[in-house]
Amino acid sequence: MCNRANGRTGMGAVMGSKNLKAVAVRGNQKPAIADKEALTELGRWGFKAFPSSGVTGLGKYGTAGVVSVQQTMGGLPTFNFRSGVFDGWKTIDGPTIYEAVLKGRETGKQDQEGRDTCFGCLIRCKRVVEINEGPYQVDPLYGGPEYETVATLGSYCGVNDLTATCKANEICNKYGLDTISCGATIAWAMEAFEARAITSNETGGLDLEFGNAEAMVKLTEMIGRREGFGDILAEGSARASQRLGRGAEFLITAKNQEAPAHMPQVKRSLALIYAVNPFGADHMSSDHDPSYEEGFENFKKRLEVLGLTQPQKPRSLGPEKVNFARKTQHFYSLLDSLNLCQFACGPSWQLYGPVEIVKMLQAVTGWDVTIEELLAVGERRLNMMRAFNAREGINRNQDTLSEKFFEKTLKGGPSDGWKIDRVEWEAARDEYYRQCGWDVKSGEPTRHVLDRLNLG
């Protein structure tokens, strides 16, 4: 459960506007378990599998442990996606957080290494940080930054001051702001400021040069309070650009939602998913390309359960990569429908794979379900959202990315010179529609698909 903040897609801001601080639900009945022994056995299986699983490192470094991986592959978004490498990456990575600011004493549910956790969880991925001296003192009540946050409020903005990033994270969690959109919006403003599309008169005198940690922290507070220039940025970079009438060439959005810290120029299936996803750019709506590229042999048995048997070359975006994106999107949608954690459960590197998840549902409900039936649940959810969007006039025309991803090449490191090929990408989008059974011209679900999914 999320016990601190709920910011992505603006839900935290909506709660804040209503002065709603939390939603608490209490029941007085225990859920009926169809096969307790089978469920207990799955728990034992997970305990035994944990040491050799892909989630063991999350307990020590959290998701910030992947900073070095992203840097090595040229996929660490830097200076508002102008580059995929950041010279100051070591200042914001997992080991640095662990050694420098991770809370070190037991308080409440936290353990001796400053890890908060969901009830009964073996992985214990959440970070809790505390800073008691210097210009940025940070209260552990507001948790700590994970990978997305150290990137968006770090490398995106060219900031290599970990304490400033932790402080900005605290402010976001205090106000219910999404750290991804907040950091990306500030990075957009910094690039626009550098290009003189935004002036110091508009920023209220703030010097929004890349790397200015003090300005980043101050602007985060201003956004949360809708003060001064923060009021212009408070609804995201796309609306800020529209309001100012300039700066669109610096946007990194899909459906007006800022891109997370996984670069679509590097992970090409995400270039597709960011665009076609019903609620815009999201890194937790499908599996990532490496699982179906060089990492396939590690996850072969699990992916084959989903019918994924033909690993692809890096940065490819042909029909089979589209198939990977679509099927894992359905699977992740299923996980959301079941309210399962995407670190504990998933199609590749996670602790529990597709086979175990089927057994889990069978044990709890007693239903004799198959993986195909469960994938249809995820597909049904996505089509419901797609139908809602169609009613609101959101269709193929909005299934795209900001021009920057197509027009500007990355600078430096392994991804130097990379950009998204528009022709290849548009062909992949059409292929995705065909595989989904949607109308290619509009991108909307067809009557046949809606009837098949009992949504007609």
Predicted regions and their residues:
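Extended C-terminal regions of large enzymes
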Residues: 1-9, 15-456
